[in-house]
UniProtKB/Swiss-Prot annotation:
Catalytic reactions of this protein: a 2-demethylmenaquinol + S-adenosyl-L-methionine = a menaquinol + S-adenosyl-L-homocysteine + H(+); a 2-methoxy-6-(all-trans-polyprenyl)benzene-1,4-diol + S-adenosyl-L-methionine = a 5-methoxy-2-methyl-3-(all-trans-polyprenyl)benzene-1,4-diol + S-adenosyl-L-homocysteine + H(+)
Annotated binding of S-adenosyl-L-methionine, by residue: T60, D81
One Gene Ontology molecular-function label: 2-methoxy-6-polyprenyl-1,4-benzoquinol methyltransferase activity
Signal peptide: none
Gene name tied to this protein: ubiE
Record GO biological process: menaquinone biosynthetic process; methylation
Keyword Methyltransferase: yes
Protein name: Ubiquinone/menaquinone biosynthesis C-methyltransferase UbiE
S-S pairs: none
Superkingdom, natural source: Bacteria
A Pfam family annotated for this UniProt entry: Ubie_methyltran
């Protein structure tokens, strides 16, 4: 039986707390760019007729809904997240959409995905992998439930390489973002966000971690001058 670590429980509690303002703050703090990043990531998925797609760390369901909008009605989508509050809000969004019959959401951690081996054509995770305490275990679980020939698509924040832009980015991320986020939600949560991004490995280091659990043909695509990166790999 999988049990979250103390750090994992604190991160889970943090997301439960900020869930009601999560979507609003994502739009404000990213100036709305996060939507285009998600669309780019979803374009990278692979699926078959009557296929199945898993969205890990689904949050309030933005990526799951984007997948539903861009795939045939025969494709089913499952979203999982370790935050019960996030999943509850996601279920409400899905129920209010035209894709309610295609998207199922449930509470589950990335490190212990409750599905059989070789279950999904593609797996997505957006802005979630850096919050997985045992990152290698999370990647192993995604690899396990991915079908042979299937693709994982990982969207995550990254640190820009262009020096001047990197300094501006760090100023906004470290100084401005926590203050703005704290006005509407929990300050500590929006202090955690930039810290977790800065601590995340480089693109090449993360691709090496993906390859280490078995993913092949690992690639990355930098978005918006390197603020975000999409990683892909295949089984």
């Amino acid at each position: 039986m999988f049990k979250l670590t103390e750090k994992g429980e604190k991160i889970q509690e943090m997301f439960d707390t900020i869930a009601p303002r999560y979507d609003f703050l994502n739009r404000v703090l990213s100036f709305g760019i996060d939507r285009s990043w998600r669309r780019f990531a979803v374009k990278k998925i692979k699926y078959a007729p009557n296929g199945r797609i898993l969205d890990v760390a689904t949050g309030t369901g933005d990526v799951a809904l984007e997948i539903a909008a861009r795939t045939p009605s025969s494709v089913s989508i499952t979203g999982i997240d370790f935050s019960g509050e996030m999943v509850e809000l996601g279920k409400q969004k899905v129920a209010a959409s035209s894709y309610a019959g295609r998207i199922n959401m449930q509470v589950a951690p990335c490190e212990d995905i409750p599905f059989a081996d070789d279950s999904f054509d593609s797996i997505t995770i957006a802005f979630g992998i850096r919050n997985v305490v045992d990152r290698s275990q999370g990647l192993k679980e995604m690899y396990r439930v991915l079908k042979p020939g299937g693709r994982v698509v990982i969207l995550e924040f990254s640190t820009p390489r262009f020096v001047l832009f990197k300094h501006l980015y760090h100023f906004y991320f470290l100084k401005v973002l926590p203050v703005i986020g704290g006005l509407f939600s929990k300050f500590s949560a929006y202090k955690y966000l930039p810290d977790s991004v800065i601590e995340f490995p480089s693109q090449d280091q993360f691709k090496a971690t993906m390859a280490g659990v078995g993913f092949k043909n690992t690639q990355h695509h930098d978005l918006t001058l390197g603020i975000a990166t999409v990683y892909t790999g295949e089984k």
